């Protein structure tokens, strides 16, 4: 199985409490571990004003998760975020550093 480095950033509704935020983070970390992901690093980016409203919210709580996993896990994680009522937007990118590229 080919493992790649991914970075997922998601935005939570601004009315989420810190305890609800931690519950969501632990759910996503458990999901990543369950499907073979590792090297999980979570960064709280805090509450920020959005440039445009998303689902009638003008602020959001940003959370970033970096991890190593297969592409199948990314689909599973994004589906869980899509079904969550607290996540208003998410995005996953594959980290590809220049020194990893073979010419």
From Swiss-Prot:
Keyword hit for Chaperone: no
GO biological process: translation
UniProtKB keywords: Chloroplast, Plastid, Ribonucleoprotein, Ribosomal protein, RNA-binding, rRNA-binding
Keyword Chloroplast part of the UniProt annotation: yes
CC annotations in GO: chloroplast; ribonucleoprotein complex; ribosome
InterPro entries, alphabetized: Ribosomal_bS6, Ribosomal_bS6_sf, Ribosomal_S6_plastid/chlpt, Transl_elong_EF1B/ribsomal_bS6
Organism domain of life: Eukaryota
Family: Belongs to the bacterial ribosomal protein bS6 family.
HAMAP family tied to this protein: Ribosomal_bS6
Name of the molecule in the record: Small ribosomal subunit protein bS6c
């Amino acid at each position: 199985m080919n493992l790649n480095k991914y970075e997922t950033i998601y935005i939570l509704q601004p009315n989420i409490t810190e305890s609800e935020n931690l519950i969501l983070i632990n759910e996503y970390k458990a999901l990543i571990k369950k499907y073979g992901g590792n090297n999980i690093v979570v960064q709280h980016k805090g509450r920020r004003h959005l440039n445009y409203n998303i689902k009638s919210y003008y602020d959001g709580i940003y959370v970033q998760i970096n991890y190593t996993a297969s592409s199948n896990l990314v689909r599973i994680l994004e589906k869980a975020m899509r079904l969550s009522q607290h996540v208003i937007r998410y995005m996953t990118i594959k980290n590809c550093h220049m020194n990893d590229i073979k010419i």
